[in-house]
Amino acid sequence: GPSLPPAMAHSNVVPPPRHGRNAGVAFDPSWIEDCRINLSASERRVATLPGRRTVKKDAQAAWLLKAVTCMDLTTLAGDDTAGRVRRLCAKAMRPVRADLLESLGMGERGIRTGAVCVYHRFVATAVAALAGSGIPVAAISTGFPAGLVPHDVKLREIEESVSDGAAEIDIVITREHVLTGNWKALYDEMRDFRAACGQAHVKAILATGDIRTLRNVARAAMVCMMAGADFIKTSTGKEATNATLTVTLTMLRMIRDYHDRTGFKVGFKPAGGISAAKDILNYQILMKEELGRDWFEPDLFRIGASSLLADIERQLEHHVTGRYSASN
């Protein structure tokens, strides 16, 4: 594919992944035509998931701790403050109570979340709060959540977040390009976003609740990967419908297809409405079955979440003590 512009100097570089970064490929409409999705088969596959594969009790705690390390701990509220962001960063550095980690034999291991995700206004605050922790800051960008600001404003927003120290940028695509089948426009937009990010990794939010069909989800995913997305992400968390297992299966199969065609590994991030520990186990099972162990690590799997962490902590406490503390 065409080479990308040189990376910009960067203050908070992501640790290099265990695999090469997705460089993208030249736009090829035939790849989009090839995206075939069988809705009823996908729904059947997902419906049988909870009964077909259960994670054994002892393994559950390990899987949930792994989920914590893949979490983008997030606050995206209109009433966010610097104080709230600093508290979130403190939690990201120590997401699970020390006594629980000791009981699980993980006291030495220093568990932390995959990233902290905030609005651009709070990037510098989060970078300062996380200094020395190795936890990257992810900024949502490009006129999130609707993505309807002018293109040059989107690029400037990305560049400012990167210069403030964001190591990851979660962008939103223009849904109209998907709904009208204007795939070249989507590709060009995504290519520009990737270039503006420089060394920062880019997660493409497909807003799957807005683009309506699984076929659209599949095609939008493929176009964003062709244009160099490091991750594809289900949702902003602001749509009426957020992450679902059926949409997830569709996106995972596109990741696998793209990897088969190019050799590039692209990450996956479900987001929005994932608040129960038992739900995240289903996502993990699907990831493992569709893509394998490589997609269990934070360089290829992230979970967008705010309230999920509290439930995971409750489940870990139950695992250790046999009882639940009061849900606060």
Please tell me what each predicted stretch does:
Residues 1-8, 16, 161, 197:
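Generic low-polarity alpha-helical segments
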